[in-house]
Each structure stands twice: as structure tokens, then as C-alpha cells.
Amino acid sequence: YKWLNDTVQAGIAVVDNDNGALIAVGAGRNRKRLREYNYATMIKRHPGSTAKPIFDYGPAIEYLNWSTGKMIIDDKYTYSGGGYLKNWDNSYKGIMTIETALGSSRNIPALQAFQAVSQSQIKTFVTNLGITPEYEDGYINEAHSIGGFNGTNPLEMAAAYATFARGGIYIEPYSFTSAEFLDTGEVYTVTPEKRTVMSEATAYMINIILRNAVTNNYVSAGSKSGTDIASKTGTSTIDSKYIKSLGIKGDVIGDSW
């Protein structure tokens, strides 16, 4: 890969799927000083389509018992308050399963899934994954369904997606396991808290959809590696040059911005 120029930035976070530990952080490009702005942990950016498993299909599977074979219609559609929503390719594909809809990242089915679940259920599902939505008059705006909000970074998203990989158990990322105070000799130990935030079935189905997205070449970047990968990509509607990519491979998950 060739960078466009030296000013283009990136942030990467990698966590351990098994224990939630933060394995690696790519804070940015061309770092010259200590304590510079960290693009992996400090930014708040649109997650784009990487939000769809979290805000749309995850809650629908968890609370409405949708299966991967649930049929949904990709056709001309509007937000509740009016205004047409478009797909990334400005086309409609008609009736499809949610597996196809999420795998091929269709926007209109994603909004329908978001609308099918109650606001309180979406809030519970999302916040349990460490993501903080934005509110307008007490409501989560429907733009969240396609990642249209400023509110995540690579570390938060990696931790959220790792929950799907480990069967619905969320672990807040941590970067050390113990610390000793020099003046007292007291040792502080980090004990990761594991919380079950969704059913194992929900996590399994999202994981399968993201894995099949690679197998079926919806996500071409991961399909050439010859390894078992689950992945979701996203772009911002505000800036087409802003790209996110999440990948689950074996025992690790990485999110890049």
C-alpha cells in the first residue's frame, strides 16, 4: 500500500479475543514526539458501515430473534422524518437475507433493522459494547444505523467486535496486568471483568455473517490471505477518503482508521 502523502493519518488498535488485553496500538503516522495525539484511542470519528452489526443487526437478532435467513427488502426507502436513504452504489437489490444485506453493506436494510428494534433495546445493546451513542431530544438518531455520528475510535470498536468473537462476552481493554508503587511496594493488579452482554447465538450469527462476507468476496481485502477471517469495512459519508476496516483473525481483532 502506498500512502497518498505524509499528512495522511491512521490509527490502529489490536486486542486479544481471549482475554481482552490490548496487544498493539498504532497511534499515528510519522510520530516525532512523545505524547502526541493518539489516533487509535483519542479520536471520535464516524464508524461508517462498521456500525451496522452493533446498532442494527446485532440488536435485531438479540431482541427480535431474527436469523441470518431473515428476509428484508432493499428498495426505495426514507428515514422516519423524511428524506431518502441511498445505498453506496445508488441501486436497489430487492428481497434479500440479512446475511446478504450486512455482508454486502446495504444501507436501506440496515435502517429497517434499526427501526424494527426499540430505542431502549438499541441503547442497551450498544452501551454494553462500550459505545456511546449521540442523542437528539432523548432519541438515538436514525443516522446511527449507517454510522453517521461522531463517537468511536479504533480501540472502542475493536473491543466491541471482539465481543462477537468471544461469544457475547465483553471485556474492557487493558494495557497492563499489574503495577508496583515504588514508594510503598504495594502491587496493583488488574482483574479483567467479563460481562455477558448478548446471547451466544447472536454473537455466533454476526460472526458467521462477517466471515462469509470475506468468503463471498464482499470484503476483498481479506479474501486473499488464505486464512479464516471475519471482516467489516466502512467509509464516511462526510469524507470519502476516511476509511475504516475491522478484522477478526483467530485470537486477535484489529480495527484501523
Predicted feature residues:
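Solvent-exposed loop/turn segments at secondary-structure junctions
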Residues: 18-19, 29-33, 46, 77-79, ...
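Mid-domain, small-residue-enriched loop/turn segments at the edges of structured enzyme/sensor domains
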Residues: 83-86, 118-159
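Active-site SXXK
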Residues: 20, 46-72, 101, 160-164, ...
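Sec/Tat-exported extracytoplasmic proteins
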Residues: 1, 16, 26, 58-64, ...
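Conserved catalytic neighborhood of penicillin-recognizing serine enzymes
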Residues: 65-122, 141, 170, 182-212, ...
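Structural recognition of the beta-strand scaffold that forms the well-ordered cores
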Residues: 11-15, 22-26, 71, 100, ...
